[in-house]
Design a protein with these regions (language model features):
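N-terminal, charge-rich interaction modules
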Residues: 9-89
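Short acidic, S/G/P-rich loop/turn micro-motifs used as interaction or catalytic elements
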Residues: 49-54, 81-82, 106-112, 136-140, ...
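Charged, amphipathic alpha-helical linker segments immediately N-terminal to NTP-binding catalytic cores
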Residues: 1-11
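Glycine-rich, aromatic-bearing surface loops/beta-hairpins
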Residues: 143-194
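Short, charged beta->alpha transition segments
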Residues: 28-32, 112-123
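Residue-level preference for the first positions of well-ordered beta-strands
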Residues: 40-44, 129, 158-160
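Long, charge-dense
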Residues: 72-116
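Conserved P-loop NTPase "ATPase switch" module shared by AAA+ and STAND
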Residues: 124-141
């Protein structure tokens, strides 16, 4: 989406990775409350989908910013997970011959993914950031909203979701999809910054 279209549609400028890093650093400067509700422990780093590769390529800078502010960092990339999970299944060879049947196993994959992420979150401390990347790879398979809602209660510190899409008035749209969802996560950048 061009910057002009972005401005017209969402009333703001398309941000650079440097802008996102600055917004992330600003969020890190806010003291964490231990009694924060689950939704408040979820940070949505949202950006134009055209920036996905740049954000992923510079994730190390976000990690460095977190570590410089005294926070721990854990990272999990969702992008390869469906392929790895399907390849381990006993029915993989049959599914390869009839890929149209893969839709029937998506609830099993979602349950597996939720359990895997929760197990990884259990290794985190209340001062850690768990960065969940590759959310765009779920598009068409699973709903990001369902996944995030299912794991939010297990987050001891903060969950940073890299989110290629849009945010306006509490509504998030992954990859500019028509249907968005209302979620009380902390947007980075915040509405006030943009």
């Amino acid at each position: 989406m061009s910057a002009a279209v972005w401005r017209r549609r969402w009333g703001c400028q398309s941000l650079s990775v440097e802008d996102l890093l600055e917004a992330f650093r600003s969020r890190l400067a806010v003291p964490w409350r231990s009694e924060e509700a689950a939704a408040g422990r979820v940070w949505m780093l949202w950006y134009d989908k055209a920036l996905e590769r740049r954000v992923r390529g510079r994730l190390g800078e976000f990690r460095l910013a977190a570590e410089q502010s005294g926070k721990g960092w854990h990272e999990f990339d969702l992008a390869p997970e469906f392929g790895k999970w399907v390849a381990r299944q006993t029915w993989f060879e049959r599914a390869a011959e009839k890929p149209s049947r893969l839709g029937t196993v998506l609830p099993d994959f979602e349950a597996h993914l939720i359990a895997d992420i929760k197990a990884r979150l259990s290794e985190c401390c209340p001062n850690d950031i768990f960065a969940l990347t590759g959310v765009a790879s779920l598009f068409g398979f699973l709903r990001a909203s369902s996944l995030i809602s299912s794991i939010a209660d297990a987050v001891p510190g903060r969950l940073l979701v890299t989110f290629p899409g849009t945010h306006q008035g509490g509504i998030y749209r992954l990859l500019d999809a028509r249907d968005g969802w209302s979620y009380l996560a902390v947007p980075i950048p915040s509405d006030a910054i943009v």
